[in-house]
A protein has these predicted regions:
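Conserved blade-ending motifs and adjacent loop-strand segments that build the rim/top face
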Residues: 288-312, 348-380, 393-394
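Short beta-strand elements that form the blades of beta-propeller/WD-repeat-like
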Residues: 28-32, 72-85, 121-122, 127-134, ...
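Short coil/turn segments at the loop-to-beta-strand junctions that recur within blades
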Residues: 59-62, 106-115, 153-160, 205-209, ...
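Bacterial Sec-dependent N-terminal signal peptides
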Residues: 1-33, 94, 130, 146
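Asp-box/WD-like beta-propeller blade repeats and closely related beta-sheet repeat scaffolds
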Residues: 135-188, 197-217
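Beta-strand-rich domains and repeat architectures in extracellular enzymes and scaffolds
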Residues: 25-40, 51-90
Length: 426
């Protein structure tokens, strides 16, 4: 295992990250969250892109989507993942991005050799493979036709919380807290060959500590749909919420499969919680690229478990980046009863940062449909959302004039039992 980071550089980067008020003369882009909080304004869809598309997903008997799905959009496909009720069996469905046509079901949960543990997937678009986790240390592979294609067995003993698949590597993000309440080693990124052998690691900016299980008096697994208005897309795949009785820490939120690594073009980005810098991963180096200037709302990493003064602190929850913008969501007052979720937008061309309260919605000024609810970004750089058919029909009942809107022609043939409508902004 290679750990040939220069210690002085790591100390410098850490200092740079946790004190976001100082740019130290580096050329990183600055997202001015502090100023955006002083000048809140409502975001519009036209701020996010120029074109909005609606893709109603086909509704065949074997492609009916269950409740609380996670929707991902690839270059040519739409992936929908959900757990059935009440059996909690994981399902992964594949649709055409072009017209919403149902293509196939991908794999299954279970105990047989081809089964996966969790239906949440990661994609190698070049080789056209899906990867699913299989406990304790494997990823199961399927192709885009739903055919089982083997497995990757990692040389390390635990699976990561999130993976990014590149042309030659599998990069795992370890958030340290697993479903089993067992903490991992003190590295945050593991860089693997495609055969699962570990090449090198990137150390965490801070040390994780294990709580005593006696201190946990309540644990809840909550689905992402119920949590959206509190935490946004950060918890889109659901989250464990732990309540404690000691240690001065009454609550901890651990989202499932939180995307802390992503690609923008060929750049691999990484951001660790409570660190105010987005880094570009280059080999075994972290290069500061974008800084969140939180100013008086800064949350010191050493106080990340505290609930004191959190109403005056900002937590950067979710980040989506393309060539033009960085769209992010942040929470003021995390871990309190008075938390507020904000949508943030950084325009790369102008350098302007805009924030708005999530409860105000993002006005659709392009096609005049329902307020846009960001749920992620496609691998092509489109912001993604979806609405259930019944939600769209309820809205149409209150806005009957929309029937004559040519941009919303999909509403004419919509049935309340139909699959959701995927929305893309580019």
């Amino acid at each position: 295992m290679k750990r040939n980071f220069v210690i002085i550089a790591i100390i410098f980067l850490f200092s740079f990250s946790v004190n976001s008020q100082k740019n130290n003369g580096m050329s990183s882009a600055v997202i001015d969250v502090e100023n955006g909080m002083k000048n809140l304004s409502r975001l519009k869809v036209s701020d996010l892109g120029k074109i909005i598309r609606y893709i109603p997903l086909e509704t065949p008997d074997d492609g009916l989507i269950g409740k609380n799905p996670v929707v991902k959009v690839l270059r040519n496909y739409i992936v929908v993942e959900y757990n059935t009720l009440p059996t909690q069996q994981g399902v992964c469905l594949l649709f055409s991005k072009k017209d919403g046509r149902f293509i196939t079901k991908i794999g299954h949960t279970g105990q047989d050799p081809e089964a996966y543990t969790d239906c949440f997937s990661w994609t190698d678009e070049k080789e056209e493979f899906f990867y699913f986790e299989r406990q304790p240390n494997q990823l199961i592979k399927y192709d885009m036709k739903g055919k089982f294609c083997g497995k990757v067995e990692f040389s390390t003993s635990e699976l990561a919380s999130y993976y990014l698949i590149t042309d030659s590597e599998i990069i795992g993000f370890f958030d340290a807290f697993k479903k089993s309440n067992i903490y991992t080693n003190q590295y945050v990124l593991g860089i693997y060959k495609k055969d699962g052998s570990l090449k090198e690691t990137v150390p965490s900016f801070f040390t994780y500590s294990s709580p005593h299980t006696d201190d946990i008096y309540q644990t809840n697994l909550v689905n992402g749909n119920l949590l959206y208005n509190i935490f946004g897309s950060w918890t889109r795949a659901g989250a464990f919420i732990f309540d404690y009785v000691r240690l001065g820490q009454r609550r901890q939120i651990n989202p499932l499969h939180s995307a802390r690594i992503w690609k923008n073009n060929e750049n691999i980005r990484f951001k660790q919680d409570f660190i105010d810098t987005i880094y570009t991963v280059s080999g075994n180096k972290l290069i500061p690229s974008i800084v969140f200037k939180t100013g008086k709302y800064h949350w010191p990493v050493q106080e990340r478990k505290s609930e004191k003064n959190n109403l005056e602190r900002i937590f950067i929850a979710d980040i989506n980046e393309n060539n033009s913008i960085v769209f992010f969501q942040c929470v003021r007052g995390l871990l309190t009863q008075e938390s507020v979720l904000y949508n943030g937008l950084y325009n790369k061309k102008t350098g302007k940062t805009t924030l708005s309260k999530n409860k105000d919605g993002i006005e659709d000024d392009l096609s005049h449909f329902m307020p846009f609810k960001p749920l992620g970004m496609s691998t092509s750089g489109e912001l993604v959302s979806f609405v259930e058919a019944w939600e769209a029909l309820d809205w149409l009942e209150k806005h009957p004039e929309a029937k004559n809107n040519k941009n919303l022609s999909f509403l004419k043939d919509l049935d309340e039992e139909a699959n959701p409508i995927v929305i893309l902004i580019e």
